[in-house]
Structures are given as structure tokens and as C-alpha cells.
């Protein structure tokens, strides 16, 4: 019985780890996939970068947003390390884009 419970626990842990890895890849592809803003009054576009992004960072809309929900989708430059892109928590950004840290 103990062996069966242990085996089930291992299977569940492996399934969770695989699901998390798959979700992370999907999320990363969403973050990376982006399109240009139309600008002209769209929030966070053209004239004013999103507050969470570095100044002078080109702004784009994430692929899943409408133009009224633009966010600064470009990676923040190294000199602005610690800022967030796409309102991601710093730890999530660090996991998705380790080459920037």
C-alpha cells in the first residue's frame, strides 16, 4: 500500500512539473509575440511608455490586447534592470528572460 501511494505521488509530481513547464513555454510565447501599437492616445503607446517599463523603450501592444490596452512590451534595457516588462513580477521576468539578468 505504501508503495502504491508513493508511486501515485511521484506520478502526480511529474505531471505537475510537466504542466508547469508547458504553461511557462506557452506564456513565454505570448509575451514574446507582439504587434505594433497604432498609437495616438492608446494607453502606454507612442508618446508615453508604460510606467513599469524603462523610459525611451519602444512600446508595442501584446498580441492578446486591444489597442486601448497597450503596454510596453519590449524588454527593458540592461541599465533599467529590475524594472518590469508587461507588468510581470520581477521573479517571473527573471525566469522567462534569464539572459537579461
Curated annotation (Swiss-Prot):
Residues bearing the modification Lysine amide: 81
Tissue expression from the record: Expressed by the venom gland.
Residues forming coiled coils: none
Keyword Signal attached: yes
A GO cellular component annotation in the UniProt record: extracellular region
Disulphide connectivity of cysteines: 37-54, 45-59, 53-72, 61-70
Keywords: Amidation, Cleavage on pair of basic residues, Disulfide bond, Ion channel impairing toxin, Knottin, Neurotoxin, Secreted, Signal, Toxin
Entry keyword Nucleus: no
Chief location of this protein within or outside the cell: secreted
Entry GO MF terms: ion channel regulator activity; toxin activity
Signal peptide positions (record): 1-19
Residue ranges of the propeptide: 20-35, 85-101
UniProt-annotated location(s): Secreted
Top-level lineage group: Eukaryota
Function, in words: Toxin active against insects (S.frugiperda larvae). May act on sodium (Nav) or calcium channels (Cav).
Domain notes: The presence of a 'disulfide through disulfide knot' structurally defines this protein as a knottin.
Family to which this protein belongs: Belongs to the neurotoxin 28 (Litx) family.
Name by which UniProt lists this protein: U1-sicaritoxin-Li1a
Species annotation: Loxosceles intermedia
